[in-house]
């Protein structure tokens, strides 16, 4: 092959994998460079050799082959340059990671080497905080019968979602605030003097929803206001209720259309605000209110109070130090031998306080 300094090599513009050979319109000679109409440069004609293998790029005739040694009598102006073969690189950890949302079944899909998702060790589990039970599209729990069912019915959605997706291990333990700890009982008990009944008030989205204790009716107007719906739609829903009571006198949280407990539960479940109003729809709501009340403090407080400190003027300063020492300190000092080693610093602090009081009394008398 002749060396031409001005020669430029081009990639083929023809389909090299096709069986049909391209016959030139005129015969070319391989002795001198000829003019190329496409590139407007002087190029040299190289023999194009067809192989029986389907991949023509991998099996291209050697460039040093003369036209007389070529097996084919056709000449092509362009030739194919084979791409260099690189050794197969080992898969990165990102390629070995199983992505649940990118897995295509029954296909040869290979994940790219782009770091889409960090590889987590198998002992690390998801805390389940992203499974928010207050999401509007989650399943709503059934009506809670008593307080013992609250610990069972609340994480119902977490179990159903975790069962549907086995790749995600949803647990109730969270490092910070879990999704179930947000739902704390926040009931306010008020007295409705006009109706002579107790009302249970729960706030959601800045609106107080009230439930009566005598007949368990709920203020439907405030209930639907939690959903932020329009006034026309709210009045249309309440107007279609067969059993309702209209209250026009009283506080703002008492005014409105009152509907039965069962109908209010259905509306709250349909509008997906049932979890926001917990524990308003607990049937035994009195037990939750009673559980929040402080226990009897009389059983926790000691029956005998320590004797008051006496300070009487006297000439003897040593007698003052013995009088201002409380009896409780004497009892603790006498029983110090029976206490554990962990309580000794507490007794030492009491003695330091007693010495400070003694020195203060001496300074006042002097």
Curated annotation (Swiss-Prot):
Keyword annotations: DNA-binding, Nucleus, Transcription, Transcription regulation
Q: Where is this region: Disordered?
A: 294-366
Q: Which InterPro entries match?
A: EFG1/Phd1/StuA (IPR029790), HTH_APSES_sf (IPR036887), KilA/APSES_HTH (IPR018004), Tscrpt_reg_HTH_APSES-type (IPR003163)
Q: List the disulfide bonds.
A: none
Which biological process terms from the Gene Ontology are attached to this UniProt entry? positive regulation of pseudohyphal growth; positive regulation of transcription by RNA polymerase II
Q: Name one GO cellular component term.
A: nucleus
User: Has keyword Nucleus?
Assistant: yes
- Taxonomically, the superkingdom here is Eukaryota
Q: Whereabouts does the entry annotate DNA binding, in residue ranges?
A: 220-241
Q: Where is the composition biased (Basic and acidic residues)?
A: 312-328
Q: What is its main location?
A: nucleus
Q: Which residues form the HTH APSES-type domain?
A: 186-292
Query: Where is this chain's protein located in or outside the cell?
Result: Nucleus
Q: Does the keyword Transcription regulation apply?
A: yes
Q: Which PANTHER family match?
A: PROTEIN SOK2-RELATED (PTHR47792:SF1)
Q: Record's family?
A: Belongs to the EFG1/PHD1/stuA family.
Please tell me what else the database record remarks about this protein: Present with 1420 molecules/cell in log phase SD medium.
Function, as annotated, reads: Putative transcription factor that functions in pseudohyphal growth.
Name of the molecule in the record: Putative transcription factor PHD1
Question: What organism does this protein naturally occur in?
Answer: Saccharomyces cerevisiae (strain ATCC 204508 / S288c) (Baker's yeast)
